[in-house]
Swiss-Prot record:
It comes from the Bacteria. PANTHER family: ATP SYNTHASE DELTA CHAIN. InterPro entries: ATP_synth_OSCP/delta_N_sf, ATPase_OSCP/dsu. GO terms for molecular function: proton-transporting ATP synthase activity, rotational mechanism. Keywords: ATP synthesis, Cell inner membrane, Cell membrane, CF(1), Hydrogen ion transport, Ion transport, Membrane, Transport. Gene3D superfamilies: N-terminal domain of the delta subunit of the F1F0-ATP synthase (1.10.520.20). Belongs to the ATPase delta chain family. GO terms for cellular component: plasma membrane; proton-transporting ATP synthase complex. It comes from Shewanella woodyi (strain ATCC 51908 / MS32). F-type ATPases have 2 components, F(1) - the catalytic core - and F(0) - the membrane proton channel. F(1) has five subunits: alpha(3), beta(3), gamma(1), delta(1), epsilon(1). F(0) has three main subunits: a(1), b(2) and c(10-14). The alpha and beta chains form an alternating ring which encloses part of the gamma chain. F(1) is attached to F(0) by a central stalk formed by the gamma and epsilon chains, while a peripheral stalk is formed by the delta and b chains. The lineage of its organism: Bacteria, Pseudomonadati, Pseudomonadota, Gammaproteobacteria, Alteromonadales. HAMAP family: ATP_synth_delta_bact. It is a peripheral membrane protein. This is ATP synthase subunit delta.
Length: 177
């Protein structure tokens, strides 16, 4: 995975820089997401690593994408096809979205709780995380009854485990050592 990310990063960075310059970050995110879905299609996957010439592959891929990808997006796809990198489109799209969130000072936080959180609780968590991370936070909430009580928050590299299950696990580990 690290190798794919290394290969995809320059394409994502170039697309992101261009999108910022043209004030089209959202439309580029949509284009790259669509192209990534096309590249993951079961019919398309064998063609990406197949024996088609790069220009034929680019024409085919752009034809499948149709109006969903503009002229500049098509140019990116042609360059990627020439370099045999179309299979990295999902990673390019993911990196682009990460750059978009970083640029917009946004972060997604996953909150797993033992019971459903009220809108007030979600608001409190969101405000606290925004202060701590100095970013706009989008919460993705889910329920896992095995936590017993409390919650686990994951936002980027930050993990806060305030669940009873986590506390019992840490207590068990400390008693065993």
């Amino acid at each position: 995975m690290a190798e794919i990310t290394t290969i995809a990063r320059p394409y994502a960075k170039a697309a992101f820089d261009f999108a910022i310059e043209k004030n089209a970050v959202d439309s580029w995110a949509e284009m790259l997401n669509f192209a990534a879905m096309v590249s993951e299609n079961e019919t398309m996957k064998p063609l990406l690593s197949g024996s088609l010439a790069s220009h034929q592959l680019a024409e085919l891929f752009i034809g499948v994408c149709g109006e969903q990808v503009n002229e500049q997006g098509q140019n990116l796809l042609k360059v990627m096809a020439e370099n045999g990198r179309l299979e990295t489109l999902p990673a390019v799209s993911q990196l682009f979205v990460e750059m978009k969130h970083e640029w917009a000072k946004e972060i997604e936080a996953n909150v797993v709780s033992a019971t459903e959180l009220s809108s007030e609780q979600q608001q409190e968590i969101s405000v606290s995380l925004e202060k701590r991370l100095t970013r706009k936070v989008k919460l993705n909430c889910s329920i896992d009854a095995s936590l017993i009580a409390g919650l686990i928050i994951t936002a980027g590299d930050l993990v806060i485990d305030g669940s009873v299950r986590g506390k019992v696990s840490r207590l068990s580990d400390s008693l065993q050592s």
